[in-house]
Swiss-Prot record:
Organism encoding this protein: Mycobacterium leprae (strain TN)
Record carries keyword Nucleotide-binding: no
Enzyme Commission number(s) of this protein: 2.7.-.-
Compositional bias (Polar residues): 533-542
Record's protein name: Exopolysaccharide phosphotransferase CpsY
Similarity-based family: Belongs to the stealth family.
Pfam families in UniProt: Stealth_CR1 (PF17101), Stealth_CR2 (PF11380), Stealth_CR3 (PF17102), Stealth_CR4 (PF17103)
Lineage, opening ranks: Bacteria, Bacillati, Actinomycetota, Actinomycetes, Mycobacteriales
Protein backbone atom coordinates (compact mmCIF):
# COMPACT_ATOMS: atom_id res chain seq x y z
CA UNK A 1 0.00 0.00 0.00
CA UNK A 2 1.17 3.52 -0.70
CA UNK A 3 2.84 5.17 2.27
CA UNK A 4 0.28 7.93 2.18
CA UNK A 5 -2.54 5.58 3.11
CA UNK A 6 -0.84 2.91 5.16
CA UNK A 7 -2.11 2.74 8.72
CA UNK A 8 1.05 0.90 9.70
CA UNK A 9 3.53 3.47 8.40
CA UNK A 10 4.95 5.98 10.84
CA UNK A 11 8.07 6.48 8.77
CA UNK A 12 9.63 9.72 10.04
CA UNK A 13 10.83 12.67 8.02
CA UNK A 14 14.21 14.28 8.47
CA UNK A 15 14.27 17.68 10.14
CA UNK A 16 15.83 20.49 8.16
CA UNK A 17 16.83 24.06 8.91
CA UNK A 18 17.20 25.26 5.35
CA UNK A 19 17.34 28.93 4.28
CA UNK A 20 14.56 30.61 2.32
CA UNK A 21 15.50 32.31 -0.93
CA UNK A 22 13.88 34.35 -3.70
CA UNK A 23 14.29 32.84 -7.16
CA UNK A 24 14.92 34.70 -10.39
CA UNK A 25 11.19 34.48 -11.13
CA UNK A 26 10.40 36.28 -7.89
CA UNK A 27 9.08 33.14 -6.20
CA UNK A 28 9.95 32.35 -2.60
CA UNK A 29 11.38 28.89 -1.94
CA UNK A 30 13.14 26.89 0.73
CA UNK A 31 16.43 25.27 -0.15
CA UNK A 32 16.00 21.54 0.41
CA UNK A 33 18.87 19.14 0.90
CA UNK A 34 17.40 16.32 2.95
CA UNK A 35 13.68 15.66 2.43
CA UNK A 36 12.32 13.49 -0.35
CA UNK A 37 9.13 14.65 -2.11
CA UNK A 38 7.03 12.24 -0.06
CA UNK A 39 8.62 13.36 3.20
CA UNK A 40 8.16 17.02 2.29
CA UNK A 41 4.50 16.39 1.52
CA UNK A 42 3.94 14.79 4.92
CA UNK A 43 5.83 17.59 6.67
CA UNK A 44 3.51 20.09 4.97
CA UNK A 45 0.48 17.99 5.93
CA UNK A 46 1.47 18.08 9.59
CA UNK A 47 2.23 21.81 9.38
CA UNK A 48 -1.33 22.42 8.13
CA UNK A 49 -2.79 20.13 10.79
CA UNK A 50 -1.09 22.12 13.52
CA UNK A 51 -2.14 25.45 12.05
CA UNK A 52 -5.79 24.38 11.88
CA UNK A 53 -5.77 22.86 15.35
CA UNK A 54 -4.22 26.00 16.76
CA UNK A 55 -7.18 27.97 15.38
CA UNK A 56 -9.70 25.36 16.62
CA UNK A 57 -10.81 24.58 13.07
CA UNK A 58 -12.13 21.00 12.73
CA UNK A 59 -11.27 18.95 9.65
CA UNK A 60 -11.48 15.43 8.27
CA UNK A 61 -8.51 13.55 6.87
CA UNK A 62 -9.49 12.23 3.45
CA UNK A 63 -7.79 10.07 0.86
CA UNK A 64 -8.31 11.05 -2.75
CA UNK A 65 -8.27 8.61 -5.66
CA UNK A 66 -4.57 9.31 -6.28
CA UNK A 67 -3.66 8.82 -2.61
CA UNK A 68 -2.96 12.52 -2.14
CA UNK A 69 -3.64 13.67 1.45
CA UNK A 70 -6.73 15.85 1.72
CA UNK A 71 -8.11 17.87 4.62
CA UNK A 72 -11.87 18.42 4.29
CA UNK A 73 -13.28 21.49 6.05
CA UNK A 74 -16.75 23.04 6.37
CA UNK A 75 -17.04 25.72 3.70
CA UNK A 76 -18.51 28.11 6.27
CA UNK A 77 -15.10 28.11 7.98
CA UNK A 78 -13.20 29.13 4.84
CA UNK A 79 -12.55 32.71 6.02
CA UNK A 80 -11.24 31.39 9.34
CA UNK A 81 -9.04 28.89 7.50
CA UNK A 82 -7.58 31.65 5.38
CA UNK A 83 -6.82 33.81 8.43
CA UNK A 84 -5.25 30.89 10.30
CA UNK A 85 -3.01 29.87 7.42
CA UNK A 86 -1.96 33.41 6.53
CA UNK A 87 -0.80 33.81 10.13
CA UNK A 88 0.90 30.40 10.30
CA UNK A 89 2.65 30.90 6.94
CA UNK A 90 3.89 34.43 7.56
CA UNK A 91 7.50 33.31 7.29
CA UNK A 92 7.00 30.24 5.11
CA UNK A 93 7.25 29.75 1.32
CA UNK A 94 3.76 28.19 1.35
CA UNK A 95 1.87 28.52 -1.90
CA UNK A 96 -1.78 27.78 -2.65
CA UNK A 97 -2.97 26.63 -6.06
CA UNK A 98 -6.67 26.68 -6.89
CA UNK A 99 -7.57 23.34 -8.45
CA UNK A 100 -11.26 23.71 -9.32
CA UNK A 101 -10.77 26.80 -11.52
CA UNK A 102 -8.36 26.89 -14.43
CA UNK A 103 -6.01 29.71 -15.28
CA UNK A 104 -5.33 30.93 -11.76
CA UNK A 105 -1.71 31.26 -10.70
CA UNK A 106 -0.56 29.95 -7.31
CA UNK A 107 -0.50 32.61 -4.60
CA UNK A 108 1.93 33.05 -1.73
CA UNK A 109 -0.20 32.48 1.37
CA UNK A 110 1.85 34.95 3.42
CA UNK A 111 0.52 37.74 1.20
CA UNK A 112 -2.94 37.31 2.67
CA UNK A 113 -5.09 34.92 0.64
CA UNK A 114 -5.55 31.31 -0.40
CA UNK A 115 -6.94 31.98 -3.86
CA UNK A 116 -7.69 34.62 -6.44
CA UNK A 117 -11.10 32.99 -6.84
CA UNK A 118 -14.04 34.33 -4.86
CA UNK A 119 -15.33 30.80 -4.22
CA UNK A 120 -12.53 28.21 -4.25
CA UNK A 121 -13.56 24.69 -3.29
CA UNK A 122 -10.22 22.88 -3.75
CA UNK A 123 -6.90 24.49 -2.88
CA UNK A 124 -3.58 22.66 -3.02
CA UNK A 125 -0.96 23.89 -0.55
CA UNK A 126 2.76 23.27 -0.73
CA UNK A 127 5.98 24.85 0.41
CA UNK A 128 8.10 25.51 -2.66
CA UNK A 129 11.43 23.76 -2.25
CA UNK A 130 14.49 23.70 -4.46
CA UNK A 131 16.95 20.85 -4.04
CA UNK A 132 20.58 20.95 -5.19
CA UNK A 133 20.74 20.71 -8.96
CA UNK A 134 17.50 22.63 -9.35
CA UNK A 135 14.95 19.89 -8.59
CA UNK A 136 11.76 21.71 -7.55
CA UNK A 137 9.08 20.42 -5.22
CA UNK A 138 5.94 22.09 -6.55
CA UNK A 139 2.18 21.65 -6.45
CA UNK A 140 2.49 18.04 -7.58
CA UNK A 141 3.57 17.20 -4.04
CA UNK A 142 1.01 19.42 -2.31
CA UNK A 143 -1.73 18.76 0.24
CA UNK A 144 -5.30 19.61 -0.70
CA UNK A 145 -7.83 21.54 1.31
CA UNK A 146 -11.37 20.76 0.19
CA UNK A 147 -14.28 22.86 1.36
CA UNK A 148 -17.38 20.75 1.89
CA UNK A 149 -20.97 21.88 2.38
CA UNK A 150 -22.58 20.31 5.45
CA UNK A 151 -26.36 20.58 5.01
CA UNK A 152 -29.08 19.22 7.26
CA UNK A 153 -29.37 15.87 5.51
CA UNK A 154 -26.56 15.93 2.94
CA UNK A 155 -22.84 16.55 2.66
CA UNK A 156 -21.68 17.98 -0.67
CA UNK A 157 -18.05 17.47 -1.75
CA UNK A 158 -16.43 19.35 -4.63
CA UNK A 159 -15.10 16.10 -6.09
CA UNK A 160 -15.24 12.36 -5.50
CA UNK A 161 -12.57 10.83 -3.29
CA UNK A 162 -11.32 7.27 -2.94
CA UNK A 163 -14.43 6.25 -0.99
CA UNK A 164 -17.40 8.54 -1.59
CA UNK A 165 -19.48 10.23 -4.23
CA UNK A 166 -19.82 14.01 -4.39
CA UNK A 167 -23.12 13.96 -2.48
CA UNK A 168 -23.38 11.98 0.76
CA UNK A 169 -26.46 11.37 2.89
CA UNK A 170 -25.36 12.47 6.36
CA UNK A 171 -27.06 9.48 7.98
CA UNK A 172 -24.76 7.16 5.99
CA UNK A 173 -21.55 8.84 7.13
CA UNK A 174 -19.96 7.17 10.15
CA UNK A 175 -17.16 9.09 11.88
CA UNK A 176 -13.92 7.25 12.54
CA UNK A 177 -10.33 7.89 13.57
CA UNK A 178 -7.03 6.66 12.21
CA UNK A 179 -3.50 6.88 13.58
CA UNK A 180 -1.05 7.91 10.89
CA UNK A 181 2.32 9.69 10.92
CA UNK A 182 2.28 9.68 14.71
CA UNK A 183 -1.09 11.43 15.10
CA UNK A 184 -4.74 10.51 15.45
CA UNK A 185 -6.89 11.89 12.65
CA UNK A 186 -10.66 12.25 12.34
CA UNK A 187 -11.96 10.67 9.14
CA UNK A 188 -14.87 8.68 7.70
CA UNK A 189 -15.32 4.97 8.30
CA UNK A 190 -13.86 3.00 5.40
CA UNK A 191 -11.72 5.85 4.07
CA UNK A 192 -8.43 4.24 5.07
CA UNK A 193 -9.56 0.64 5.19
CA UNK A 194 -7.57 -1.24 2.53
CA UNK A 195 -9.57 -1.00 -0.69
CA UNK A 196 -9.90 -3.73 -3.28
CA UNK A 197 -7.81 -1.63 -5.66
CA UNK A 198 -4.93 -1.21 -3.18
CA UNK A 199 -1.68 -3.13 -3.33
CA UNK A 200 -1.35 -4.05 0.33
CA UNK A 201 1.35 -6.75 0.44
CA UNK A 202 5.03 -6.24 1.24
CA UNK A 203 7.34 -5.55 -1.68
CA UNK A 204 11.13 -5.85 -1.44
CA UNK A 205 13.72 -4.85 -4.01
CA UNK A 206 16.86 -6.73 -5.06
CA UNK A 207 19.85 -5.14 -6.78
CA UNK A 208 22.67 -7.17 -8.25
CA UNK A 209 25.96 -5.29 -8.15
CA UNK A 210 29.67 -5.82 -8.51
CA UNK A 211 32.52 -3.44 -7.73
CA UNK A 212 34.36 -3.54 -11.01
CA UNK A 213 36.90 -1.02 -9.74
CA UNK A 214 38.32 -3.55 -7.25
CA UNK A 215 41.73 -4.59 -8.69
CA UNK A 216 41.64 -7.98 -6.97
CA UNK A 217 38.24 -8.74 -8.46
CA UNK A 218 39.40 -7.66 -11.90
CA UNK A 219 42.48 -9.88 -11.65
CA UNK A 220 40.44 -12.92 -10.57
CA UNK A 221 37.92 -12.33 -13.35
CA UNK A 222 40.61 -11.94 -16.01
CA UNK A 223 42.41 -15.08 -14.88
CA UNK A 224 39.21 -17.12 -14.96
CA UNK A 225 38.12 -15.68 -18.30
CA UNK A 226 41.35 -16.84 -19.92
CA UNK A 227 39.95 -20.38 -19.70
CA UNK A 228 36.57 -19.53 -21.27
CA UNK A 229 35.14 -18.42 -24.60
CA UNK A 230 32.52 -15.71 -24.14
CA UNK A 231 30.08 -14.05 -26.52
CA UNK A 232 30.22 -10.69 -28.25
CA UNK A 233 30.83 -7.88 -25.76
CA UNK A 234 30.70 -10.15 -22.72
CA UNK A 235 34.38 -9.58 -22.01
CA UNK A 236 34.06 -5.79 -22.24
CA UNK A 237 35.04 -3.57 -19.35
CA UNK A 238 31.52 -2.14 -19.45
CA UNK A 239 30.20 -5.41 -18.01
CA UNK A 240 31.76 -4.62 -14.63
CA UNK A 241 32.73 -0.93 -14.72
CA UNK A 242 30.95 1.23 -12.17
CA UNK A 243 30.93 4.92 -11.23
CA UNK A 244 28.74 4.70 -8.13
CA UNK A 245 25.56 4.30 -10.17
CA UNK A 246 24.25 2.10 -7.35
CA UNK A 247 24.22 5.06 -4.97
CA UNK A 248 21.94 7.00 -7.28
CA UNK A 249 19.77 4.02 -8.17
CA UNK A 250 19.15 3.62 -4.44
CA UNK A 251 18.45 7.34 -4.13
CA UNK A 252 15.83 6.98 -6.85
CA UNK A 253 14.11 4.33 -4.75
CA UNK A 254 14.24 6.52 -1.65
CA UNK A 255 12.90 9.55 -3.51
CA UNK A 256 10.23 7.94 -5.64
CA UNK A 257 9.19 4.56 -4.16
CA UNK A 258 8.79 4.99 -0.37
CA UNK A 259 6.54 1.92 -0.25
CA UNK A 260 9.51 -0.46 -0.70
CA UNK A 261 9.94 -2.51 2.50
CA UNK A 262 13.56 -3.71 2.26
CA UNK A 263 16.41 -3.58 -0.22
CA UNK A 264 18.75 -6.53 -0.80
CA UNK A 265 22.06 -6.09 -2.64
CA UNK A 266 23.26 -9.37 -4.14
CA UNK A 267 27.03 -9.09 -4.36
CA UNK A 268 30.31 -10.74 -3.44
CA UNK A 269 32.06 -7.39 -3.50
CA UNK A 270 32.97 -5.36 -0.43
CA UNK A 271 30.12 -2.90 0.24
CA UNK A 272 30.76 0.53 -1.28
CA UNK A 273 32.47 3.06 0.98
CA UNK A 274 29.46 5.39 1.03
CA UNK A 275 27.03 2.71 2.27
CA UNK A 276 26.29 2.73 6.00
CA UNK A 277 24.68 0.01 8.09
CA UNK A 278 20.94 0.51 7.88
CA UNK A 279 17.94 -1.72 8.69
CA UNK A 280 16.50 -1.29 5.19
CA UNK A 281 19.65 -2.53 3.43
CA UNK A 282 20.91 -6.14 3.45
CA UNK A 283 24.05 -7.31 1.66
CA UNK A 284 23.58 -10.85 0.32
CA UNK A 285 26.71 -12.78 -0.78
CA UNK A 286 26.18 -15.50 -3.36
CA UNK A 287 26.88 -18.28 -0.87
CA UNK A 288 23.77 -17.21 1.05
CA UNK A 289 21.38 -17.80 -1.84
CA UNK A 290 22.99 -20.18 -4.34
CA UNK A 291 21.57 -23.69 -4.02
CA UNK A 292 24.87 -25.13 -5.31
CA UNK A 293 27.85 -23.48 -3.65
CA UNK A 294 30.24 -25.49 -5.79
CA UNK A 295 29.21 -23.19 -8.66
CA UNK A 296 30.95 -20.29 -6.90
CA UNK A 297 32.61 -17.98 -7.51
CA UNK A 298 30.58 -16.77 -10.46
CA UNK A 299 30.99 -13.85 -12.83
CA UNK A 300 27.69 -14.54 -14.55
CA UNK A 301 24.70 -12.25 -14.00
CA UNK A 302 22.38 -14.92 -15.41
CA UNK A 303 23.55 -17.32 -12.70
CA UNK A 304 22.91 -14.77 -9.96
CA UNK A 305 19.46 -13.98 -11.35
CA UNK A 306 18.54 -17.66 -11.44
CA UNK A 307 18.94 -17.85 -7.65
CA UNK A 308 17.29 -14.64 -6.42
CA UNK A 309 14.23 -16.45 -5.09
CA UNK A 310 16.45 -18.18 -2.51
CA UNK A 311 17.50 -14.97 -0.77
CA UNK A 312 16.62 -15.41 2.92
CA UNK A 313 13.68 -13.33 4.21
CA UNK A 314 12.86 -11.96 0.76
CA UNK A 315 9.17 -11.12 0.36
CA UNK A 316 6.96 -13.16 -1.96
CA UNK A 317 6.49 -10.13 -4.21
CA UNK A 318 9.70 -8.33 -5.06
CA UNK A 319 11.40 -6.17 -7.67
CA UNK A 320 14.72 -6.83 -9.35
CA UNK A 321 16.99 -4.14 -10.75
CA UNK A 322 20.51 -3.39 -11.94
CA UNK A 323 22.56 -0.42 -10.84
CA UNK A 324 22.07 1.33 -14.19
CA UNK A 325 18.28 1.36 -13.86
CA UNK A 326 16.56 4.32 -12.20
CA UNK A 327 13.10 5.43 -11.13
CA UNK A 328 12.51 8.75 -12.86
CA UNK A 329 9.52 10.09 -10.93
CA UNK A 330 7.13 9.03 -8.13
CA UNK A 331 5.81 5.52 -8.71
CA UNK A 332 3.06 3.46 -7.15
CA UNK A 333 3.30 -0.22 -6.35
CA UNK A 334 0.49 -0.74 -8.88
CA UNK A 335 2.99 0.04 -11.63
CA UNK A 336 4.44 -3.42 -10.95
CA UNK A 337 1.67 -5.50 -9.36
CA UNK A 338 -2.09 -5.82 -9.44
CA UNK A 339 -3.89 -5.88 -6.07
CA UNK A 340 -4.05 -9.67 -6.43
CA UNK A 341 -0.32 -10.00 -7.07
CA UNK A 342 -0.27 -10.33 -10.85
CA UNK A 343 3.06 -8.96 -12.10
CA UNK A 344 3.21 -6.24 -14.77
CA UNK A 345 6.19 -6.22 -17.13
CA UNK A 346 7.22 -3.79 -19.86
CA UNK A 347 7.84 -5.19 -23.32
CA UNK A 348 10.27 -3.42 -25.63
CA UNK A 349 9.50 -2.77 -29.28
CA UNK A 350 12.69 -4.63 -30.19
CA UNK A 351 12.14 -8.11 -31.61
CA UNK A 352 14.31 -10.97 -30.46
CA UNK A 353 15.28 -11.79 -34.02
CA UNK A 354 15.66 -15.02 -35.93
CA UNK A 355 18.10 -17.84 -35.45
CA UNK A 356 19.09 -19.93 -32.47
CA UNK A 357 21.67 -19.45 -29.77
CA UNK A 358 25.24 -19.16 -31.02
CA UNK A 359 28.46 -18.87 -28.97
CA UNK A 360 29.43 -15.76 -30.93
CA UNK A 361 26.30 -13.84 -29.93
CA UNK A 362 26.16 -11.76 -26.76
CA UNK A 363 24.92 -13.47 -23.62
CA UNK A 364 21.83 -11.26 -23.69
CA UNK A 365 20.85 -12.27 -27.24
CA UNK A 366 21.61 -15.93 -26.65
CA UNK A 367 19.52 -16.12 -23.48
CA UNK A 368 16.51 -14.60 -25.24
CA UNK A 369 16.68 -17.34 -27.86
CA UNK A 370 17.10 -20.08 -25.25
CA UNK A 371 14.09 -18.67 -23.40
CA UNK A 372 12.10 -18.69 -26.64
CA UNK A 373 12.89 -22.30 -27.44
CA UNK A 374 12.17 -23.42 -23.89
CA UNK A 375 8.73 -21.79 -23.78
CA UNK A 376 7.88 -22.93 -27.31
CA UNK A 377 8.69 -26.52 -26.36
CA UNK A 378 6.68 -26.31 -23.13
CA UNK A 379 3.63 -24.32 -24.24
CA UNK A 380 3.70 -24.26 -28.04
CA UNK A 381 3.73 -20.45 -28.01
CA UNK A 382 6.43 -18.22 -29.48
CA UNK A 383 7.76 -15.12 -27.72
CA UNK A 384 8.96 -12.39 -30.07
CA UNK A 385 10.02 -9.33 -28.06
CA UNK A 386 12.69 -8.32 -25.59
CA UNK A 387 11.82 -6.50 -22.37
CA UNK A 388 12.73 -2.91 -21.63
CA UNK A 389 15.84 -2.35 -19.53
CA UNK A 390 13.93 -1.50 -16.35
CA UNK A 391 13.23 -2.77 -12.87
CA UNK A 392 11.03 -5.87 -13.09
CA UNK A 393 8.48 -7.45 -10.71
CA UNK A 394 8.81 -11.09 -9.67
CA UNK A 395 7.16 -13.61 -7.36
CA UNK A 396 9.12 -16.17 -5.37
CA UNK A 397 6.48 -18.87 -5.64
CA UNK A 398 6.43 -18.64 -9.44
CA UNK A 399 10.23 -18.76 -9.57
CA UNK A 400 10.33 -21.91 -7.42
CA UNK A 401 7.68 -23.42 -9.69
CA UNK A 402 9.78 -22.58 -12.76
CA UNK A 403 12.84 -24.16 -11.17
CA UNK A 404 10.88 -27.38 -10.74
CA UNK A 405 9.53 -27.10 -14.30
CA UNK A 406 12.97 -26.51 -15.86
CA UNK A 407 15.49 -28.02 -13.41
CA UNK A 408 18.22 -28.74 -15.97
CA UNK A 409 18.15 -25.22 -17.38
CA UNK A 410 18.29 -23.60 -13.95
CA UNK A 411 21.14 -25.88 -12.85
CA UNK A 412 23.11 -25.35 -16.05
CA UNK A 413 22.79 -21.57 -15.80
CA UNK A 414 23.77 -21.55 -12.13
CA UNK A 415 26.92 -23.53 -12.98
CA UNK A 416 28.02 -21.20 -15.81
CA UNK A 417 30.91 -19.11 -14.50
CA UNK A 418 30.45 -16.56 -17.30
CA UNK A 419 27.45 -15.84 -19.49
CA UNK A 420 27.08 -18.84 -21.77
CA UNK A 421 25.34 -19.55 -25.04
CA UNK A 422 23.09 -22.04 -23.24
CA UNK A 423 22.01 -19.81 -20.33
CA UNK A 424 18.44 -18.93 -19.59
CA UNK A 425 17.71 -15.36 -18.53
CA UNK A 426 15.20 -15.72 -15.72
CA UNK A 427 14.54 -12.04 -15.07
CA UNK A 428 14.64 -11.03 -18.73
CA UNK A 429 12.47 -12.55 -20.02
CA UNK A 430 11.76 -16.15 -19.02
CA UNK A 431 9.84 -15.39 -15.83
CA UNK A 432 7.59 -12.79 -17.41
CA UNK A 433 6.48 -14.80 -20.41
CA UNK A 434 6.10 -17.96 -18.35
CA UNK A 435 3.92 -16.01 -15.91
CA UNK A 436 2.02 -14.39 -18.79
CA UNK A 437 1.20 -17.72 -20.40
CA UNK A 438 0.15 -19.24 -17.07
CA UNK A 439 -1.99 -16.28 -15.96
CA UNK A 440 0.33 -14.69 -13.38
CA UNK A 441 1.55 -11.68 -15.42
CA UNK A 442 0.28 -9.05 -17.85
CA UNK A 443 1.96 -6.40 -19.99
CA UNK A 444 2.37 -2.94 -18.47
CA UNK A 445 1.51 -0.63 -21.35
CA UNK A 446 1.33 2.75 -19.60
CA UNK A 447 4.90 3.14 -18.38
CA UNK A 448 7.22 5.67 -20.01
CA UNK A 449 10.73 4.27 -20.42
CA UNK A 450 13.95 5.72 -21.84
CA UNK A 451 17.10 3.78 -22.73
CA UNK A 452 20.31 5.82 -22.95
CA UNK A 453 23.61 4.50 -24.26
CA UNK A 454 26.00 6.64 -22.23
CA UNK A 455 29.03 5.55 -24.24
CA UNK A 456 27.73 7.49 -27.26
CA UNK A 457 27.53 11.26 -27.65
CA UNK A 458 23.98 10.91 -28.91
CA UNK A 459 23.03 9.25 -25.64
CA UNK A 460 24.88 11.69 -23.39
CA UNK A 461 23.22 14.60 -25.17
CA UNK A 462 19.82 13.29 -24.04
CA UNK A 463 20.64 13.81 -20.37
CA UNK A 464 20.07 17.59 -19.98
CA UNK A 465 16.55 17.37 -21.40
CA UNK A 466 15.82 14.26 -19.33
CA UNK A 467 16.81 16.10 -16.15
CA UNK A 468 14.83 19.19 -17.10
CA UNK A 469 11.58 17.44 -17.99
CA UNK A 470 11.63 14.46 -15.60
CA UNK A 471 8.83 12.92 -17.62
CA UNK A 472 9.86 9.24 -17.66
CA UNK A 473 8.87 6.61 -15.12
CA UNK A 474 12.08 4.67 -15.72
CA UNK A 475 15.36 5.25 -17.47
CA UNK A 476 18.43 3.11 -18.02
CA UNK A 477 21.91 4.61 -18.38
CA UNK A 478 23.62 1.74 -20.10
CA UNK A 479 27.38 1.39 -20.30
CA UNK A 480 27.83 0.06 -23.83
CA UNK A 481 30.43 -2.52 -24.79
CA UNK A 482 31.68 -0.53 -27.81
CA UNK A 483 32.30 3.00 -26.50
CA UNK A 484 32.55 6.16 -28.57
CA UNK A 485 33.08 8.48 -25.58
CA UNK A 486 36.29 8.41 -23.49
CA UNK A 487 35.71 6.78 -20.10
CA UNK A 488 36.68 9.88 -18.09
CA UNK A 489 34.35 12.14 -20.05
CA UNK A 490 31.50 9.66 -19.76
CA UNK A 491 32.00 9.31 -16.01
CA UNK A 492 32.07 13.07 -15.47
CA UNK A 493 28.91 13.73 -17.46
CA UNK A 494 26.93 10.80 -16.07
CA UNK A 495 27.81 11.48 -12.42
CA UNK A 496 27.03 15.18 -12.85
CA UNK A 497 23.63 14.27 -14.28
CA UNK A 498 22.86 11.74 -11.54
CA UNK A 499 23.87 14.10 -8.74
CA UNK A 500 21.50 16.74 -10.08
CA UNK A 501 18.65 14.33 -10.82
CA UNK A 502 18.87 12.60 -7.43
CA UNK A 503 20.26 15.28 -5.07
CA UNK A 504 18.73 13.98 -1.83
CA UNK A 505 21.02 11.59 0.11
CA UNK A 506 19.29 8.41 1.23
CA UNK A 507 19.26 7.56 4.95
CA UNK A 508 21.65 4.66 4.37
CA UNK A 509 24.40 6.88 2.99
CA UNK A 510 27.39 8.01 5.01
CA UNK A 511 26.82 11.77 4.89
CA UNK A 512 27.45 14.69 7.19
CA UNK A 513 25.28 14.20 10.26
CA UNK A 514 23.87 17.71 10.39
CA UNK A 515 20.31 16.44 10.43
CA UNK A 516 18.34 13.60 11.94
CA UNK A 517 15.26 11.86 10.70
CA UNK A 518 12.36 13.69 12.26
CA UNK A 519 9.84 12.01 14.48
CA UNK A 520 6.38 12.88 13.18
CA UNK A 521 5.13 12.85 16.76
CA UNK A 522 7.20 15.96 17.51
CA UNK A 523 6.54 19.43 16.09
CA UNK A 524 8.17 20.49 12.86
CA UNK A 525 10.64 23.32 13.20
CA UNK A 526 8.45 26.08 11.83
CA UNK A 527 5.01 24.68 12.57
CA UNK A 528 2.68 26.20 15.16
CA UNK A 529 2.10 23.92 18.11
CA UNK A 530 -1.37 22.56 18.69
CA UNK A 531 -1.67 24.14 22.13
CA UNK A 532 -1.38 27.63 20.72
CA UNK A 533 2.34 28.11 21.35
CA UNK A 534 4.98 28.62 18.69
CA UNK A 535 7.84 26.21 18.13
CA UNK A 536 11.27 27.60 18.92
CA UNK A 537 13.77 26.35 16.32
CA UNK A 538 16.57 26.51 18.87
CA UNK A 539 14.63 24.15 21.15
CA UNK A 540 13.18 21.80 18.56
CA UNK A 541 16.23 21.27 16.38
CA UNK A 542 18.19 18.14 17.30
Amino acid sequence: MSKIVSCEDDRPVRRTLEPIIVTRQGKVARLESSLTPHEAQIEDLIFLRKALNRADIPFLFIRNHKNRPVLAINIKLRPAVERALVTACASEPMYAKTIDERGLSPVLVAKGQLSQSIDPRIVRLYRRRIAPGGFRFGSRFGVELQFWSFEETLIRCPVENSLTRKVLPRKEVTPATIKLYGYKWHTIEGMFTPHASDVTFDIDLVFSWVDGSDPEFRARRAAEMSHHVVGEGDDADARIRQIDELKYALRSVNMFAPWIRRIFIATDSIPPSWLADHPMITIVPAEDHFSDRSALPTYNSHAVESQLHRIPDLSEHFLYSNDDMFFGRPLKASMFFSPGGVTRFIEAKTRIGLGTNDPTRSGFENAARVNRQLLLRRFGQLITRHLEHTTVPLRKSVLFEMEQEFPEEFARTQESVFRSGTDISVTNSLYHYYALITGRAVQQEKAKVLYVDTTSYTGLNLLPELRKRRNYDFFCLNDGSFPEVPATERAERVVSFLERYFPIPAPWEKVATDFNRQDFASPTVSAPLEDGQTANPAQTAR
